[in-house]
Design a protein with these regions (language model features):
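Intrinsically disordered, low-complexity effector-like regions enriched
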Residues: 113-114
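Charged, gly/pro-rich active-site loop segments
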Residues: 9, 27-31, 35-58, 134-203
Length: 203
């Protein structure tokens, strides 16, 4: 490992990544028993789908298909984080008014939510072969809704939760609202109609 770090310093590193990042990635790679992975190799992997030719689906048709899938499910994996801290929480959701809504008693996801509004959530089917892939990744902004505000009470009504019952709880239920910024959709079935299996919706 020392030889590889020395090589980075002598040769001036690879690509444009800061020296500290390259050294950190070298240590991580060696400690995990893997080969030496450069910044450029990480970037190439990250950009894999960006560089693929895309045959876009008509936006309205895509949105209709995505909405049907979202409404046919009720559980997502919600990723939150701040600094080196990350959390991924399975949580029930509802979707209305173009946003995702989640009631939560609490938990460590709020460590990230306090300091970082940027979140990601995923809805997906279990793997059943490459021809049956179906998933949505949502990048969005999270807000906490004020307890017993009009917005809070409206969602409680949609969930058929009596507001008076909620008011009797020792601590109010937290209501998380996620506004989508981008949805990355992967449906194998799109290929049957001549479209790319991966589609993107920007909001």
């Amino acid at each position: 490992m020392c030889n590889k770090i020395t090589e980075i310093i002598i040769n001036g590193a690879v690509g444009t990544a800061p020296l500290s990042i390259l050294i950190k990635n070298t240590i991580k790679s060696v400690m995990s028993g893997g080969g030496f992975v450069t910044h450029d190799q990480f970037k190439k992997a990250a950009d894999y789908w960006k560089n693929k030719k895309q045959n876009a689906m008509p936006e309205e048709k895509l949105k209709k298909t995505v909405l049907e899938y979202i409404n046919s499910n009720n559980t997502c994996a919600l990723a939150t984080g701040t600094g080196d801290y990350v959390r991924c929480t399975p949580i029930e959701y509802s979707y209305h008014d173009g946003k995702f809504w989640m009631f939560s008693e609490g938990g460590e996801k709020f460590i990230g939510l306090e300091k970082n509004e940027n979140v990601c959530l995923a809805i997906y089917d279990k793997y059943d072969g490459a021809d049956n892939l179906k998933s949505i990744q949502v990048i969005g902004k999270a807000d906490l809704v004020e307890p017993f505000s009009d917005t809070y009470n409206k969602h409680a009504k949609i969930k058929k939760l009596p507001v008076e019952t909620l008011k009797k709880l020792a601590s109010p239920m937290n209501l998380i609202c996620v506004t989508p910024v981008k949805m990355e959709v992967l449906f194998s079935e799109f290929k049957k109609n001549g479209y790319s299996s991966r589609q993107t919706i920007n909001f």
